[in-house]
Amino acid sequence: MTGTAAMDIRPILSTLMRHKIASLLIVLEIALTCAIVCNALFLIGDRLDRMNMHSGIADHELVRIQAASLRQLSSDDAVDKSVSLEYLDTLRKVPGVRQAAIVSQLPFGGSSNNSSVNLTSDQERPTLDATVYTDEGSLVKTFGLKLLAGRDFNSDEFQDITDLQKAGDKAQIPVAIINRSMAEKLYPGQNAVGKVFYSWTESPTRVIGVVEELARPNSLDQGAYAMIFPLRDYGAGKHYILRTEPGRRAEVLDAAIKALKKTDPNLLVVNQDTFDEVRARYFEQDRAMAWMLVVVIVALLLVTALGIVGLASFWVQQRTKQIGVRRALGATRGQILRYFQLENFLLATVGIALGMLLAYSINQLLMGKYELPRLPLHYLPIGAIALWLLGQAAVFGPARRAAAVPPAVATRSV
């Protein structure tokens, strides 16, 4: 702090004490803005983190067709299997299709099949809750999952899900592939391949592979735990996932629908879209929330800036004679300008200090009501710097007008 600035502090404080109500109002306005802006920035960051969550699959190469046939209205397992295999064979022949698979669900798809997971058969409380993907034989390659350890399923490890259901107490799912998040939770610091867990059946399931990541269809706040069972699920209305080149997705999707309609006139298409579109729909509310918070931040900053401009302009008008006297006594325009900037800086600093305490209190309330995480400390200096800069920008106009007051004003006002 320069010597001139230090000398200005005492008269500034004296002036502010004579205008307690106005000073208090601007301090409270800055404090409230700081508190809301810090928490809003945090919530925007949280939403952006969710929206940018890694799915683990080849996002830009996949299209989804959710379809069924009127022939499947009989609820006959044999018919379901016949129709599903017929559709899958048709889709694999479509030009541009590199891989195709039938899946029961897909990341960010909304509907999720979940199951508790135990490490021992007699465990009372589950270790975790994981989403369950069923694989008819080509899920790993079609999704583009990255194997970190172990291997993919062998052909002799697959079974129809209807056979599993008919087996009753004797049902077994000998092997499974899990994602890294689940592996780290179940077996921290260990190699998960070869380890066993219990889920769906009374028999142990052995881990044969670990994929880097595989997101849940929903309930993202429940942990990113996912497992893949080698189960062929041929029920009506399943998802047919096609993998192609990013630039050919629309072309392949259109050709695939035409091929299916040619194969089966009784085709019923429930959904047809790219995975990017699936993802965009899932995070639509998060995106809307982020934009709403941006609008709130801009509105608050604008109102605060207008308040600072209005108050500073009022004070300049009231102190015209005082400014003229200081100019007559030798004060330069720069000194007058810095005087008002320092005055604003002091008000903003008090408001920001109160705002940080208020921001933390609001965050504690949100944590209790909506289970949000704790406000990271780095958002506080971000909000502080933003308000300091805003204050200096807002006061610059009135301060320049004050600096332009000529010394002669002092004599005319006498």
Language model features with spans:
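Membrane-helix entry/capping segments
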Residues: G3, M7, S14, R18, ...
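Intracellular coupling helices
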Residues: A6, R10-M17, I21, L306-L347, ...
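Alpha-helical transmembrane segments
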Residues: L32-H60, M367
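Membrane-interface junction motifs in transport/secretion proteins
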Residues: D49-K81
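Hydrophobic alpha-helical transmembrane segments of polytopic membrane proteins
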Residues: L302-A305, Y379-R401
